[in-house]
């Protein structure tokens, strides 16, 4: 059994290079750490022939060399320029003297021996009082009836207090050093770009008209007219609802159905071929290959194929979907691609050309521009009083839009007389009272007691129809005040004859309840 050798990993290159003191370091590790590999040699040889100094390649700093651009200053940049203050007496030479500078140690308090002198405060009284009282007041005739009184304010008393405290108080006179560099003057400069910022001029003088920018608000008739009246002309209208702005690129090759190199161009006169091309496809049946040739169908005769109207439509086997097109003349039409089967070999291969069938739609002439007017045909063939209106309409259309004719409506007669339009009046009226409420609506029929219709049948002994009255054909007068009571009683709650929704049945019509004796 073969023993599989185990691959032993080599130590880290950093550890191997550290142990190379004896000279047994691998060559690849040595070249890597001493930068003596093939890549390092190529860089050394290339740098000897090509000088790339100053471009900052291989370093983190890059500076523009000769021939490069310098960045322009942007607008609104604030620069700090140190200048001397107004009270500075610093010489123009070195800021410090050439002598040694004394150092002050930390924690040492500076003391200056000075003598404190307290000034004497002397009270000086004012020579003139604060309030002046005149001897006499001038009389103003415009101010009458007013009492003017002068108020005298006493002078306040001033008390001066002598300062008390120790006399050995140190007073330090601290002056700014001559070499103080904390005094700066900040100046800013803003550059305006006239391409993006317009010049704004504010005029404070009101009514000044000597400037160049004058605003004159006036009508159309003030001043000289420098314009020119140009009459607008209408261009030709678009041929489609959404006109294409880009030019239509011409299609080449087999995608161009109008190419005579790939397709035979045929104009179709029958629109049926474009709408239903399957009517031009027909075939023959061979009885020898039918599954049941001896059925009872000998008397049925197969319809002979219809002969195409055009000879170019023969031998068509396949047609494509219809597509609209626009030819070079600008006319719109519908076209299809067809495949003919003129020759068929024994192996079943059909040979035939491809034909482009196109059907051009009729051109719609602009009757308004060519003829100037459109003649309206009479669609109503009735000969009656409406003939005068038709004649008037034709007269208006023939004379133009500016001619109008006043038509007297009373002059037009009616096909029916007023007597025929009057409805028949019924002598047996039956009114209906409708009581409407927000919640419900009740309809109560009201029968006129002066007219009674003849009933279908008379019930002897009934309260609805009396038996002792001789009812003849037609309406008769019946007195129902004593003999018949109405089934529904409507109470009259108003003086003016207004009926309310207060109805109830007559007590005689209520069903009698049987009493139960316990």
Curated annotation (Swiss-Prot):
Subcellular location: Virion; Host nucleus; Host early endosome; Host Golgi apparatus
SS bond partners: 20-25
Region (Disordered): 68-100
Chief location bin: virion
Gene Ontology MF term list: DNA binding; structural molecule activity
Motif (Nuclear localization signal): 2-11, 511-517
A Gene Ontology cellular-component term: viral capsid
Post-translational modification: Highly phosphorylated.
Record's keyword terms, sorted: Capsid protein, Cytoplasmic inwards viral transport, Disulfide bond, DNA-binding, Host endosome, Host Golgi apparatus, Host nucleus, Host-virus interaction, Late protein, Microtubular inwards viral transport, Phosphoprotein, Viral penetration into host nucleus, Virion, Virus entry into host cell
Gene Ontology terms: biological process: microtubule-dependent intracellular transport of viral material towards nucleus; symbiont entry into host cell; viral penetration into host nucleus
InterPro entries, sorted: Late_L2
Domain of life: Viruses
Family assignment from sequence similarity: Belongs to the papillomaviridae L2 protein family.
Function: Minor protein of the capsid that localizes along the inner surface of the virion, within the central cavities beneath the L1 pentamers. Plays a role in capsid stabilization through interaction with the major capsid protein L1. Once the virion enters the host cell, L2 escorts the genomic DNA into the nucleus by promoting escape from the endosomal compartments and traffic through the host Golgi network.
Quaternary structure note: Interacts with major capsid protein L1. Interacts with E2; this interaction inhibits E2 transcriptional activity but not the DNA replication function E2. Interacts with host GADD45GIP1. Interacts with host HSPA8; this interaction is required for L2 nuclear translocation. Interacts with host importins KPNB2 and KPNB3. Forms a complex with importin alpha2-beta1 heterodimers via interaction with the importin alpha2 adapter. Interacts with host DYNLT1; this interaction is essential for virus intracellular transport during entry.
Name of this protein: Minor capsid protein L2
Higher taxonomy: Viruses, Monodnaviria, Shotokuvirae, Cossaviricota, Papovaviricetes
Name of the gene encoding the protein in the UniProt record: L2
